[in-house]
UniProtKB/Swiss-Prot annotation:
The gene is Sgo2a. InterPro entries: Shugoshin1/2. Its main location: nucleus. Belongs to the shugoshin family. This is Shugoshin 2A. Shugoshin is Japanese for guardian spirit (as it is known to be a protector of centromeric cohesin). Ubiquitously expressed in proliferating cells. Highly expressed in the testis and oocytes. One of its GO terms (cellular component) is mitotic cohesin complex.
């Protein structure tokens, strides 16, 4: 048997070894696999991180490379554009050089070949010189001048602006050459006549020799020119001047025109002594002469001055050297071409009509010859350069041109020759180009002029040179614009300039045609502009007037009447100056008057505002008026707002209970504070608004006083309700309020008592004038109290009267006597917040209010006047009052159970009674416990307690008489459903309201008691409501207590139990029997114990304190027996005993206590 067992063990051991080995291997493999996996993961994470970094680096590098490539491409594009521009400029420069070389070659050939032709043309001018003398006074024209072009020899401007002009210039040149060739007559077919014309065309582009220019500018001689008339061919085309005119109109700006001079215009090289280069002068075929600013030449027929250059002289010499058969045709064409070239120099082009530019077979062209004159006239020439005159075309000039053409046709050549011979006789013959004699006999220049023409030349030359000065000044003044100077006709500066003689218009005015208006432009500097034009409107008006009068003057006088014209213009300008200054002065005076009137009106309005406006003072926006009135208004309004709190008299009490009305004093102080704010002001102006508001507030105060007088006790009690606002700082201290005691309501009219009270309050105010007003918080709290009191005063007073009447009607003569002896005062319940828990039937609020009113008005006591002497005054008494009533369970709203009774407490010689409100959770139920004949059962009702903040607040309770039999007072707890109906005067959120009843007057006489009885009997007849209301009359203290009240025992006290249930955070309302010797002070907190301080004269009061439960309750049980010590009132005692058992069963209500501690205490 052992063998198999051994065998099994060996097998199992082997199996176990194998299994263990396999397990170890698998574990090793798993561990290795996990390690490998971990390594792989680590490596992969490392790889991922490295790849991310590499990717980022590559992306950055790629972005950089892209940016570099973009930059390179942009630079490449810019370089390509620059290369293209440079290539274009190179090609342009090559073209310029080529054209320049061609022009130089042409100029050289022209200078060498065309000199003799110009001399021949100048010799032919003698025969056609006198044809223009017939229409001397009818063909006057204004000289047209142009600014010189300062172009050096062979200068080429290589700017991009002129690139497009070169081709146009070349085309224009070829057109002019073709036109010149085409205009030759068919009769002259020789190429010799065409070659000089082309050479002359090239000569126009050339420059004169240096030596001639030096002689012309340096010699100081003035060359006067005479015209040579050349008849053009009949086959001359009419379209050629029109085309040339269109080319002139479409010519570019003056800067571009200077560029064209190098291509197709006559140029002069500025060199040596010459200040300005001379420019070619050529007259139009319509007899319209043009003058260069360099020199002045006078046409003796027209009366104009013009200056010609040496280049014109040489052209004339070249024209004279031409063959006779072909000289007439190309010369006219050359003159035409020269006119086109010279017109391009003018910045202000002259506009011609197409009819004026047409050439006919009878039109005569002029070529100018040069002669020498005096040296002193060259100085005037230098002053009159660089000037351009604008030629204005008039309607009459066209007619004169036509008449001059007709006269030129009929003009005789003989008269011209005779005048030329006379001129030669008077003046010596001059040699062209400053040389001695001409090589050709026909080259004698026609310098013979008549003496009459010579004198007219001098006169017109002087006038024209002076006029150029005037035009130069005017042009400079006109173009000096914008910020520094302003142009306006007939300014003060211009008149002064005329008077100083800087230029004399009598001798220097330019001659105008009869139809041309004169126009002057003057400069006004900034220093004068402010004086002349104070206002922009005046400036516009004056400028309009001057523009209207600017065209008033038209020169309808001849040349000899220029002085009169000048005088007339000067006088007109002076008159205009006076009128302008008068208008300026008038406008200034008017504006000043308007401003003064406005300011005066504003001042008067301000005075009216200060005098009449009682509410707002609007200060106008002037610098001379102060801006303090608004601040005064705001300060005054602030003071008045602070004084709004005193609209109704606020009465406050101190330790002595004295009162003070703060309203009047604060209002009077307000008048003193307001003048102190701004002593420099008139007090009457500042205090107007406060006075008005103070008057309104005084009316309000008087209205309130009247209301208090009319409404009777309500307002007086309203004032009295605030007496305790300051007493809350003194808990436990009872004040003597005897001075506030009001007499009994012995009169039918209750207003008398209110008047008495008002007088008493005023006396108190006088009694303590130094008292400080209460803080603002107290006044605000008083306001809230007063607001709520006003709403509830009438209801409370009415219900009080009803209850008094009901009580008087239901009771017998005993109760009537009680009413006679009691000082009745109405109680004002002041509630800050009504407890919001309303009963399910919805009528709890009304019923609670009415119940509260019933309790407040129906608790009375009786004081036996015969027993006053038996009691000593008690120091600091605190009467604990318990007011109870029972709400009928079957009635809702204001209906009350018929079993409700009034609890009467008898007080002897007590000055104050304090009522402390109970919490909403406090419930009283009558305990139907077995009581002996010595026990008294107090049948209370549900009550609404009013809050009293301090135990020092004084309350008086009317006392009722009762028989010698003591009554048993049992505290009664109400059910929870009725608890909600109690509108308590003190909620957890608020501090509670104060209830005040004036104490009884202990010294009332019997007569006053009988008058009271009559009053109450009348009230009972008027208002009767519930007959079941009755007061429970307790046994008076005078019957139970003996004369040795200080050593009182159980027999000297009224045997009654005073159980009170007290909740947290609430003050207590305690009821004590007729004994006033005990003073109880209760302070109730959430977790604090109540302290009960009982007087030393109540040793038999027993305090019971219930610890279980969250709420602490105090039960005061007075176990003292009642001893009948007053046999003088047996009737009262018997009536009290008989009335009390009758209502005991109706007042018994089963206990409904939620807390067992309170139930057990109440059963005790």
């Amino acid at each position: 048997m052992e063998y198999p067992g051994i065998k099994v063990d060996t097998v199992t051991s082997g199996i176990q070894r194998r299994v263990k080995g396999r397990i170890a291997k698998t574990n090793l493999n798993v561990s290795l696999a996990s390690k490998i996996k971990a390594k792989i993961l680590n490596n992969s994470s490392i790889f991922k991180i490295s790849l991310k970094h590499n990717n980022r680096a590559l992306a950055r590098a790629l972005s950089k490379e892209k940016e570099n490539s973009r930059r390179i491409t942009t630079e490449k594009m810019q370089l390509q554009k620059e290369v293209e521009k440079l290539n274009f400029e190179n090609t342009f420069l090559r073209l310029k050089l080529n054209t320049l070389n061609k022009k130089l070659v042409e100029i050289e050939s022209h200078v060498s070949n065309d000199l003799l032709t110009a001399i021949e043309i100048s010799s032919l001018s003698e025969f056609h010189q006198g044809s223009f003398l017939l229409s001397a006074t009818k063909k006057q024209r204004n000289s047209k001048q142009c600014k010189p072009a300062h172009l050096p020899y062979a200068r080429v401007l290589l700017t991009s602006e002129n690139d497009d002009d070169d081709g146009a210039d070349d085309k224009w040149q070829t057109k002019c050459n073709n036109r010149t060739i085409s205009k030759t007559s068919p009769d002259s077919t020789s190429s010799v006549s065409r070659q000089p014309s082309s050479l002359h065309q090239c000569n126009l582009k050339a420059f004169p020799p240096k030596e001639d220019n030096q002689k012309t500018c340096g010699s100081g001689h003035l060359e006067h020119t005479s015209s040579v008339d050349i008849l053009p061919n009949e086959s001359h085309s009419d379209q050629s001047p029109k085309s040339s005119l269109s080319e002139m109109k479409t010519a570019p700006s003056p800067s571009l025109r200077r560029e064209k001079l190098s291509h197709g215009n006559v140029t002069m090289r500025k060199k040596c002594v010459s200040s300005t280069p001379d420019i070619l002068y050529v007259t139009d075929l319509d007899h319209q002469p043009t003058s260069s600013p360099g020199s002045n030449w006078n046409n003796e027929i027209h009366g104009h001055t013009n200056e010609t250059s040496n280049n014109t002289q040489r052209n004339a010499e070249c024209f004279l050297d031409l063959p006779s058969e072909s000289s007439s045709e190309p010369d006219a064409k050359r003159m035409e071409l020269v006119q086109k070239n010279t017109d391009s120099f003018h910045f202000q082009k002259t506009v011609y009509d197409a009819a004026d530019m047409e050439l006919t077979a009878t039109d005569i062209g002029k070529i100018v010859a040069v002669s020498k004159s005096k040296k002193n006239q060259n100085k005037k020439k230098a002053d009159c350069r660089k000037e351009t005159f604008r030629k204005v075309k008039g309607a009459s000039s066209d007619k004169k041109r036509e008449s001059s053409k007709r006269e030129c046709k009929d003009g005789s050549e003989v008269g011209a020759e005779e005048e030329a011979d006379a001129a030669r006789a008077e003046r010596g013959a001059g040699v062209l180009d400053g040389r001695g004699d001409s090589e050709e006999p026909n080259c004698i220049s026609s310098t013979e002029q008549p003496s009459q023409v010579n004198t007219q030349k001098k006169r017109t030359l002087q006038n024209s040179s002076d006029q150029e000065n005037i035009q130069n000044t005017k042009r400079r003044q006109t173009y000096t614009t914008d910020e520094q100077e302003e142009t306006n006709p007939f300014s003060r500066h211009s008149v002064k300039f005329l008077q100083d003689g800087k230029f004399d218009l009598c001798q220097k005015t330019l001659h105008h045609n009869l139809s041309k208006p004169s126009r002057q432009t003057f400069v006004i500097r900034k220093s004068e502009k402010d004086n002349l034009f104070p206002n922009q409107e005046d400036k516009d008006t004056i400028s309009e007037n001057l523009e209207v009068t600017n065209e008033f003057h038209i020169d309808d006088l001849s040349i000899e009447a220029n002085e009169n014209v000048c005088d007339h213009e000067t006088q007109t300008m002076l008159d205009l100056k006076k009128s302008v200054s008068a208008q300026q002065n008038q406008t200034k005076i008017n504006k000043t008057k308007q401003k003064i009137n406005r300011r005066t009106k504003i001042i008067s309005v301000m005075s009216q505002v200060y005098e009449d406006n009682d509410k707002d003072i609007h200060v106008l926006e002037k610098d001379n008026f102060p801006f303090h009135t608004q601040a005064n208004k705001e300060t005054t309004s602030g003071n008045l707002e602070s004084s709004k709190e005193f609209e109704s008299p606020l009465l406050f009490t101190r330790d002595n209970g004295s009162l003070r009305d703060c309203k009047t004093q604060n209002v009077l102080d307000l008048h003193k504070q307001i003048p102190d704010l701004y002593p420099d002001r008139n007090e009457s102006q500042i205090s107007k608004i406060p006075r008005q508001k103070v008057n309104r507030k005084t009316e309000v105060i008087s209205g309130v006083k009247c209301f208090s007088n009319d409404q009777g006790v309500h307002c007086s009690e309203k004032d009295k309700s605030l007496l305790l606002q300051k007493d809350k700082d003194f808990p436990g201290t009872l004040k003597d309020l005897s001075e506030f005691d009001t007499p009994a309501f012995c009169n039918k009219d209750s207003a008398k008592s209110c008047d008495y009270k008002s007088e008493m309050l005023l006396g108190l105010k006088k009694h303590d004038p130094n008292m400080q007003p209460a803080c603002q918080d107290d006044s605000k709290a008083g306001k809230k109290l007063r607001q709520k009191v006003n709403r509830k005063t009438e209801i409370i007073s009415k219900i009080t009267q009803i209850h008094e009447n009901d009580r008087g009607s239901t009771h017998d003569s005993l109760n009537k006597k009680l009413c006679q002896k009691v000082n009745i005062s109405k109680i004002i319940s002041q509630m800050n917040q009504i407890y919001e828990t309303i009963n399910e039937d919805g009528n709890g609020f009304k019923s609670s209010i009415k119940d509260c009113e019933d309790i407040k008005s129906c608790d009375f006591g009786e004081i036996n006047s015969n027993k006053k002497e038996n009691y000593d005054p008690i120091q600091d008494p605190c009467t604990l009052v318990k007011k109870t009533k029972r709400k009928g369970s079957c009635k809702a709203g204001s209906s009350l159970a018929g079993a409700k009774n009034r609890c009467g407490l008898q007080l002897t010689d007590s000055s104050q009674v304090q009522s402390v409100p109970l919490d909403s959770g406090l419930r009283h139920h009558p305990n139907e416990a077995d009581s002996g004949p010595g026990e008294q059962t107090n049948l209370p009702k549900m009550q609404k307690q009013s809050a009293g903040r301090s135990l020092g607040d004084a309350f008086s309770v009317s006392l009722g008489k009762e028989g010698s039999r003591p009554a048993k007072a049992v505290s009664k707890m109400t059910p929870k459903s009725k608890k909600r109906k109690l509108p308590l005067g003190c909620s957890p959120e608020t501090h509670g309201t104060v209830e005040i009843t004036p104490n009884t007057d202990l010294a009332k006489a019997v007569d006053s008691q009988q008058t009271e009885k009559e009053n109450y009997l009348e009230k009972e007849k008027i208002a009767k409501r519930k007959p079941d209301f009755c007061t429970k009359v307790l046994k008076p203290l005078s019957e139970t207590c003996s004369s040795n009240i200080k050593n009182s025992s159980l027999d000297s006290m009224c045997k009654s139990s005073l159980p009170l249930s007290i909740s947290s955070r609430k003050t207590l309302m305690l009821e004590e029997s007729s004994s006033l010797e005990s003073t109880c002070i209760f302070q109730v907190g959430d977790a604090a114990h109540e302290k009960i301080t009982t007087g030393t004269r109540n040793p038999h009061h027993r305090t019971q304190k219930s610890t279980p439960g969250s709420r602490t309750s105090l039960v005061l049980v007075d176990t003292s027996s009642v001893s009948d010590t007053n046999p003088a009132n047996p009737e009262n005692e018997s009536e009290g005993q008989s009335s009390h058992p009758m209502r005991r069963k109706r007042q018994c209500v089963p206990l409904n206590l939620t807390e067992p501690s309170l139930r057990s205490k109440m059963r005790r």
